[in-house]
Curated annotation (Swiss-Prot):
Binds 1 heme b (iron(II)-protoporphyrin IX) group per dimer. Gene3D superfamilies: 1.10.520.10, Peroxidase, domain 2 (1.10.420.10). It comes from Alkaliphilus metalliredigens (strain QYMF). Its cofactor is heme b. It catalyses: H2O2 + AH2 = A + 2 H2O; 2 H2O2 = O2 + 2 H2O. GO terms for molecular function: catalase activity; heme binding; metal ion binding. It is an enzyme of class 1 (oxidoreductase). Homodimer or homotetramer. This is Catalase-peroxidase 2. Formation of the three residue Trp-Tyr-Met cross-link is important for the catalase, but not the peroxidase activity of the enzyme. Residues 1-20 form the signal peptide. InterPro entries: Catalase_peroxidase, Haem_peroxidase, Haem_peroxidase_sf. Belongs to the peroxidase family. Peroxidase/catalase subfamily.
Amino acid sequence: MLLPLIVFLLSVLIHHRIYSSFFLHFYSPQYYMICSRLTLLSSCSWHDFHLKLILLEFASQSTNPVPALHNDPTYEKISRRFHENPEAFADVFARAWFKLLHRDMGPQTRYLGPEVPEEELIWQDPIPAVDYELTDAEIAELKAKILDSGLTVSDLVTTAWASASTFRGSDMRGGANGARIRLAPQKDWEVNQPEQLTKVLTVLEDIQNQLDKKVSIADLIVLGGSAAIEKSAQDAGFDVTVPFALGRGDATQEQTDIESFEVLEPISDGFRNYQKKQYSVSAEELLLDKAQLLNLTAPEMTVLVDGMRVLGTNYNGTQHGVFTDRVGTLTNDFFVNLLDMGVEWKPMDGGLYEARNRKTGEVVRTATRVDLVFGSNSVLRALVEVYAQDDNKEKFVGDFIAAWIKVMNADRFDLD
């Protein structure tokens, strides 16, 4: 019943240009509360106030005035403009309603049907189409150049993860496509360590500029991560190829709504052992939230945390959870040492823990709650015990690569 009602109201408002005296009566307190809730639920910024003004048409017929909306010069101008210009009202309403109904559908490439608008809107996070192809030989050559550039495995994996892990399955935003990690606001996020990020991006851009063929920075970032993982697996004794799907474009700053992207900034990323501050929610619960936004399963989350630790991707290079002497090598050392019964874990300040040798009392490693939940939670510990087995090292490498590719391609809707 709701859909026909919506269609009818749209038809009345747009085709017959009927706009009520709503804009002169102004709004009741109930309207204002609905307006605020719409702002939160639809990720609409306050400069989109048109949306709130128009949608309140459907809320109630109450005409109790709200002095702020009547007297505030900004709100009054908007209301009066719509009252005096019904065509502008109809256009803004159509756009605002379209935005509200499609806000969680992701980019325009996910839309289906003959009525998809040709115009791309900035809130759809547009990305230029790719117009190049590379052969397998050219991709292999690119990998070699990246590995010879002086960037470490940690540099390449951290940057690729930072770019791709912004993806949110809840509204299909974020991800590596577009390479917005090099643009504001992502390039300045604390979790991305701007100084280190700038160093890596500068090297990748130099490689891009030296190429005879066109390739996007977005593809180079992901390819760099793939090359680094292949090297780390080879150092562990496994000759593997990380699948790579070409076709990411580079968005521009003009195609990026800074205010809209600020809400994607992570307050916590357990995969990089990062947390902005202490929250009422535990660090391990924030890890679960991050994992579900990335559409990861429990095994996928588990292998990714191990791999990220042993590859040295911790925020600011901390050693918490880095349970290995072979940093940069893709091993299951994190799992093996987490299960070490020769140490006793004791709490420290700041939500950290230290492992002391049961015989000598020497501190041998430190960890966060995120690290230790893989030993304390029954489901996660069962997974850890599987991957810690000597005969499952190759399985771990294969499963890590599969989970890694899932994150790298999370926003590649063109591959579905």
